[in-house]
């Protein structure tokens, strides 16, 4: 019932502003107090006060709730009731929703006694106090919900043990033991679907009489609380259990939890969000220690990553072992990037930059392992060139080598360039997917899959002058040097810029771009993915935004590799209205954030990426929505809202108007 109430509130977008039924609100206090009375009041007539504050006092005196928790609940309850009363006086109606309008919230804050000062407004002080109160209430509420469950599990475990262990184990009070149906219902309310697995995991986590076992037993209510807030609590609990059964991992985990409860909270979030992350952390428990320190989670700069990669590789001989070092570094860094993403520390652009810097560093280090004897560089294209990678992105690249004064058609020169490219690709891709450092895609090279892997500068110049198509001008907008010989790369970019900008865009060029975009819309969405909710190729989604920006760039002569930054440049140059840029930006950010999150939530260890559309299966959509802090219905509604608004801009600017008018 409580879960349904909260779902209704969340569906209406009132989770933080609804002070009565929302998380951390008045009902959380009342539900928790009434639950404790129901569990313990059957055998203890001293805790049956009908008033919430009176019952809290009795429960605290009887030891059923800690003194600190009782004080937090009582203070929060008084504050929330005061807010409720003042709100209803101000609004002159029966309401429990804090106004979203700044002026109304400022007025309410002043009625409550908050005042402006040089550092913050009354409304800001009220918001801070309210959010702090809701956070405290929610934490205590959920901890109390789980305590009877743990006592029941402990009692059941004691009954199943032999007499020797039974004498050493604390007996649970008869009144605290819940029947199996009640236990299952309580667990389901917090997202735990598997009763037997939950009980087994709890026993593993808190079993034994060692100091670490006692600490885990004390932390369990809090751990279950944190896991209940993740997309998949059962998965998170399994991840904790898998760590505990490894002696070295258990010791590190308990030590970290003792020193940093914040690391414990963050670990629960990661384990309950992503199966792939959970498996990697299980095999590399030393990563647990960095989770509690924001400084440790800061993305490592590109040059420092290159240095670390090269240091790791020098410690190993042989290509396979060196490749394994790069894979290990990639996975370590992905945990940090994903943690910052899931914790809300980084936004979409910051995540894209971090993923791109990591990819650049891996390629730079890989080049040093392939014994390149002539100037050679890697040009990033597409999202890689724009430093806007997602977790699911392949790396679009071109290879450039310097053949000196040799004729670009010379067979020896061509063979030498191909040999360099093949050696590099063989090292990076490895003999199988498990030994792959990154996935490189050379589909944008001249002549596509039929063309040579690498060309020298004159070879590219000849191709651009004679055979290049309009789409290749568009693709080169995002070209950027990402690894290898920088001087050579800059010479390539200068030549590419001449090809892109020296000739004005014609109506035939625009028609060509529009035809290709229309064909992609018709042909590229896989049959098993929902076109109505496609995050990459759907109407008004990522591809629409990128193509519209690039068409405007070519027409107005505005360079730029990144979509989001270029949107701002287009506005600054008067090539795009601010409202249109906002619509495109909102859709891009929403779709990219959702796509990234679905990759983390839906990807399997060692498996391929999940689809680029919102999942169609209800349980998958629910997990994704929970990870994004919303509901399945609200997530679909938000997709429709932002993409329809963006599509209207795309229809007008990309397909509709004559750019020359």
Regions found by a protein language model. Name each.
Residues 1-661:
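A nucleotide- and high-energy phosphate-metabolite-utilizing enzyme signature
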């Amino acid at each position: 019932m409580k879960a349904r109430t909260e779902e209704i509130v969340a569906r209406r977008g009132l989770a933080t502003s609804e002070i009565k039924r929302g998380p951390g609100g008045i009902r959380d206090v009342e539900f928790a107090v009434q639950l404790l009375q129901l569990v313990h009041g059957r055998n203890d007539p001293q805790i049956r006060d009908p008033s919430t504050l009176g019952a809290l006092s009795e429960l605290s005196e009887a030891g059923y709730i800690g003194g600190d928790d009782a004080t937090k609940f009582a203070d929060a309850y008084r504050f929330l009731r005061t807010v409720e009363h003042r709100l209803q006086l101000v609004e002159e109606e029966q309401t429990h929703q804090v106004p979203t309008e700044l002026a109304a919230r400022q007025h309410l804050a002043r009625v409550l006694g908050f005042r402006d000062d040089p550092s913050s407004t009354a409304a800001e002080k009220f918001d801070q106090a309210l959010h702090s109160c809701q956070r405290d209430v929610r934490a205590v509420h959920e901890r109390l919900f789980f305590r009877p469950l743990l006592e029941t599990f402990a009692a059941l475990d004691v009954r199943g043990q032999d007499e020797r262990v039974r004498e050493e184990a604390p007996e649970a009070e008869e009144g605290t033991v819940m029947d199996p149906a009640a236990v299952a219902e309580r667990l389901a309310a917090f997202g735990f679907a598997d009763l037997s697995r939950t009980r087994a995991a709890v026993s593993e986590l808190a079993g034994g009489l060692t100091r670490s076992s006692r600490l885990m037993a004390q932390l369990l209510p809090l751990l279950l609380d944190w896991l209940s807030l993740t997309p998949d609590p059962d998965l998170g609990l399994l991840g904790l259990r898998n760590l505990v059964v490894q002696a070295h991992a258990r010791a590190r985990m308990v030590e970290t939890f003792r020193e940093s409860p914040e690391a414990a909270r963050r670990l629960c979030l990661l384990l309950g969000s992503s199966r792939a992350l959970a498996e990697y952390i299980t095999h590399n428990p030393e990563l647990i220690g960095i989770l509690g320190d924001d400084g440790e989670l800061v993305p490592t700069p590109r040059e420092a990553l290159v240095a670390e990669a090269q240091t790791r590789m020098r410690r190993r001989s042989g290509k396979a072992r060196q490749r394994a070092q790069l894979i290990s570094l990639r996975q370590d860094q992905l945990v940090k990037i994903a943690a910052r993403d899931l914790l809300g520390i980084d936004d979409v652009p910051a995540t894209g930059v971090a993923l791109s810097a990591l990819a650049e560093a891996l390629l730079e280090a890989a080049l040093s392992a392939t014994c390149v004897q002539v100037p050679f560089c890697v040009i990033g294209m597409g999202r890689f060139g724009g430093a806007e990678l997602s977790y699911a992105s392949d790396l679009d690249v071109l290879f450039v080598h310097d053949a000196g004064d040799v004729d670009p058609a010379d067979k020896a020169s061509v063979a030498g360039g191909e040999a360099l490219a093949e050696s590099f690709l063989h090292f990076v891709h490895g003999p199988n997917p498990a030994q792959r450092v990154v996935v490189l895609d050379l589909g944008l090279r001249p002549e596509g899959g039929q063309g040579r892997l690498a060309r020298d500068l004159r070879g590219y110049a000849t191709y651009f002058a004679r055979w290049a198509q309009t789409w290749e001008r568009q693709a080169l907008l995002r070209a950027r040097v990402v690894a290898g010989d920088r001087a050579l790369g800059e010479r390539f970019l200068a030549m590419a810029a001449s090809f892109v900008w020296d000739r004005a865009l014609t109506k035939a060029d625009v028609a060509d771009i529009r035809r290709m975009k229309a064909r992609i819309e018709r042909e590229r969405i896989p049959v098993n993915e929902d076109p109505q909710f496609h995050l990459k190729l759907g109407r008004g989604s990522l591809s629409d935004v990128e193509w519209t920006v690039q068409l405007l760039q070519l027409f107005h002569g505005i360079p730029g590799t990144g979509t989001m930054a270029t949107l701002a440049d287009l506005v600054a140059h008067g090539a795009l209205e601010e409202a249109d840029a906002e619509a495109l930006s909102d859709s891009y950010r929403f779709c990219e954030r959702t796509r990234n999150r679905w990759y983390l939530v839906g990807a399997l260890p060692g498996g391929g990426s999940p689809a680029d559309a919102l999942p169609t299966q209800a349980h998958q959509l629910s997990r994704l929505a929970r990870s994004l802090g919303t509901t399945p219905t609200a997530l679909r509604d938000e997709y429709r809202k932002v993409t329809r608004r963006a599509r209207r801009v795309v229809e007008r600017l990309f397909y509709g108007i004559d750019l020359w008018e």
